[in-house]
Amino acid sequence: VSDAEGAVTKVAGVSKQDGVKNVFVRGLGDRYNATTFNGFALPSEDPEYKNISLDFFGTDIIQSVGVNKAFNAGGSSDVGGATIDIVSKELIGSGHLGFGISGGLNTQTVAADFLKQDGVNFMGFANRTEPADENSWNFRNKLDPSAQHLQINRSYSISGGKRFYVGKDKNPLSFFLTAGHTTDYQYTDEIIRNTTTSGTVYKDMNGKKYAENISQLALANVDFDMQNRHHISYNLMMIHANTQSVGDYNGKNSIFSDDYEN
């Protein structure tokens, strides 16, 4: 188990389907579930979905994950499947420093040409320079995709923290910070077929889709315990996600005309 998504699939009634974002709870998908972080609702990084991707949350930032499949007064009212609550990690002990690195590749596609869009850097940030003259602009980015010959999935992470003791009562004050970067490549052979209600086929295409997903996550935690009677904790989380894809398809697509061959 390397992230929150893998953790919740170990719970009875929770499953994951390849190619589909997030998990199913008792057969109910994204629109029926809710995701919270330390009890607070989380927005999705993708406007097409209700829930944030659980694979953003690696085990290095998770203290525990809870799955509540029953209605309760403290939960969201629009949940028919489950509420998934992610509890962030706090510093244990006097200090901590850790590094992580991982990689992977698909031996069947590593030697093949992988098509990429132009316009983003290694960190997944795009060129957002606005033209001074809207009537004339020399675009830096090319519409033609570039070919990459070695696709290596990679992930880096760093975490660290320190505990101090404040005042004559030596109340513990701890700081914890973790950050990570992930790059993931996906290649799929696709068949796309659509018909009208009368059964007329208006789209029949075969092709390949190349997708690159780049994301960063940073989490900071400050925790103060006053004489074991009062507890104050503050968490700050930042997520950046960039998804780009290139599709190369051949076949029939007659959405905008009676008979169009692509």
Show where each model-derived region lies.
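Short aromatic-centered micro-motifs
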Residues: 35
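Outer-membrane beta-barrel translocator domains and adjoining extracellular loop/strand segments
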Residues: 110-115, 187-194, 245-253, 259
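Flexible, solvent-exposed coil segments and beta strand-coil junctions
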Residues: 45-46, 62, 132-141, 194-204, ...
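Short strand-turn segments of transmembrane beta-barrel domains in outer membranes
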Residues: 94-163, 207
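Outer-membrane beta-barrel architecture
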Residues: 24, 66, 83-85, 159-161, ...
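Transmembrane beta-barrel wall of Gram-negative outer-membrane proteins
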Residues: 141-247
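Short beta-strands and strand-coil junctions in structured, solvent-facing domains, enriched
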Residues: 14, 32, 42-43, 71-75, ...
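Periplasmic N-terminal accessory/gating domains of Gram-negative outer-membrane beta-barrel systems
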Residues: 1-31, 39-73, 80
